[in-house]
Amino acid sequence: MKKLTTLLLASTLLIAACGNDDSKKDDSKTSKKDDGVKAELKQATKAYDKYTDEQLNEFLKGTEKFVKAIENNDMAQAKALYPKVRMYYERSEPVAEAFGDLDPKIDARLADMKEEKKEKEWSGYHKIEKALYEDKKIDDVTKKDAQQLLKDAKELHAKADTLDITPKLMLQGSVDLLNEVATSKITGEEEIYSHTDLYDFKANVEGAQKIYDLFKPILEKKDKKLSDDIQMNFDKVNQLLDKYKDNNGGYESFEKVSKKDRKAFADAVNALGEPLSKMAVITE
């Protein structure tokens, strides 16, 4: 009996040991898988860092040309550059939180400044937009504002390499931006003087889509259906924007967009935002 008990105990210990080995193997596989995902997230974030650097570099170059047009009193050239140069900034807007106080200096609207009782501090592209499109003049104040804009654009460009960009900021920033497009920008409040809102919308969508494209390989391993749903909704939004392309590679005035199409666009962006908000699954 004692011998049998000893044999049973030995067998139990052997099974337990094998079980522990299997458990260790499973833990090892999970750990390697987690390390793999972390490496992919790091690589995607690094690629987005590079993308943001490129956009801000082009933004600075474009701003230099824009300011030169202001200095030369070239209203037509300044207006031609305005929406196109801003697209570089708008593509970077998912991570504008990382820009600190340079974001409001460059991109604040008068309505926002009034709400905060800071209208005397108003500066940036939208202040110059008002001068060009509503006041229809370039004066010494406009030129001074242009120089300040260039100074801020240079500072942002210099800061680009030190921006604290994380997967969480990228994901949350893209969702928040599209929500802003669908709920407030769609009213035309962003480009209230120039009505070049469609350029902004396109750039915002491109910025969010860049984030999706970079994380797509990771997402497809976790949830292929969700990834396909996001892609389908991006396609729908872009199709609606394409409807208002002009013959010069730009976009029609937002004033030409019908109420029906504004609603359709807002609905499409909302429909995109819903699955996009679930992309955080890649960090789990």
From Swiss-Prot:
Recorded family membership: Belongs to the EfeM/EfeO family.
Gene3D superfamilies per record: M75 peptidase, HXXE motif
PANTHER family on file: IRON UPTAKE SYSTEM COMPONENT EFEO
UniProt-annotated location(s): Cell membrane
Transmembrane segments: none
Keywords (A to Z) from UniProt: Cell membrane, Lipoprotein, Membrane, Palmitate, Signal
GO CC list: plasma membrane
Membrane disposition: Lipid-anchor
Entry keyword annotation includes Signal: yes
Protein name per the record: Efem/EfeO family lipoprotein
UniProt-listed NCBIfam families: EfeO (NF041757)
Signal peptide bounds: 1-17
Residue positions of covalent lipid attachment, annotated as N-palmitoyl cysteine: C18
Lipid-anchored residues (S-diacylglycerol cysteine): C18
InterPro entries (UniProt xref): EfeM/EfeO_iron_uptake, Imelysin-like, Imelysin-like_EfeO/Algp7, Imelysin_sf, Iron_uptake_EfeM/EfeO
